[in-house]
Amino acid sequence: MRVMGVDPGLTRCGLSVVENGRGSQVVALDVDVVRTPSDAPVSKRLLAVSDVVEHWLDAHHPDVMAIERVFSQQNVSTVMGTAQAGGVIALAAARRGIDVHFHTPSEVKAAVTGNGAANKAQVTAMVTRILALQAKPTPADAADALALAICHCWRAPMIARMAEAEALGARHRQAYRAKVAGEVKATR
């Protein structure tokens, strides 16, 4: 499975592509950070991020995209910009029929380091080790994008099993309701 990991942002947006192999083996194929000037209009910044993401989607053909879920921060304008960038990125993937999954920062940290409260240095160190990189990915947005992709590779089987279980549960509920409705009609 080829996964594109995205750490969304307007000033810096981390992008990565990894491929998983046997077991927990993951190989990094590409990583970069898109930068936009903070003094540019938001629409221009979103367009710049979108253009680069669309190029990456066309060049790398990921099977799935993993985006960091925006969480509440103190700075509302930062949250808005991050959410807007994430929306533009998810839309680009959806237009190509690519599944998009969102992971919280604590899910990513727990998957990569074993500690949902790990700091940036710990995440970067583990990403470097997991991918057997010669150098630490910089800036932190690049490491975060790789961590998101790794997280999804490792969580995808569980996500698929949960979806199957939910679908089976829905079928059982529907069958049970039909049975009960039939029994009610029979008693009338």
Swiss-Prot record:
Record's function text: The RuvA-RuvB-RuvC complex processes Holliday junction (HJ) DNA during genetic recombination and DNA repair. Endonuclease that resolves HJ intermediates. Cleaves cruciform DNA by making single-stranded nicks across the HJ at symmetrical positions within the homologous arms, yielding a 5'-phosphate and a 3'-hydroxyl group; requires a central core of homology in the junction. The consensus cleavage sequence is 5'-(A/T)TT(C/G)-3'. Cleavage occurs on the 3'-side of the TT dinucleotide at the point of strand exchange.
Keyword Metal-binding in annotation: yes
Gene it is expressed from: ruvC
Recorded catalytic activity of this chain's protein: Endonucleolytic cleavage at a junction such as a reciprocal single-stranded crossover between two homologous DNA duplexes (Holliday junction)
GO CC term (a single one): cytoplasm
Residue positions of the active site: D7, E68, D141
Cofactor binding, per record: Binds 2 Mg(2+) ion per subunit.
Protein name: Crossover junction endodeoxyribonuclease RuvC
Names of the cofactor(s): Mg(2+)
InterPro entries attached to this UniProt entry: RNaseH-like_sf, RNaseH_sf, X-over_junc_endoDNase_Mg_BS, X-over_junc_endoDNase_RuvC
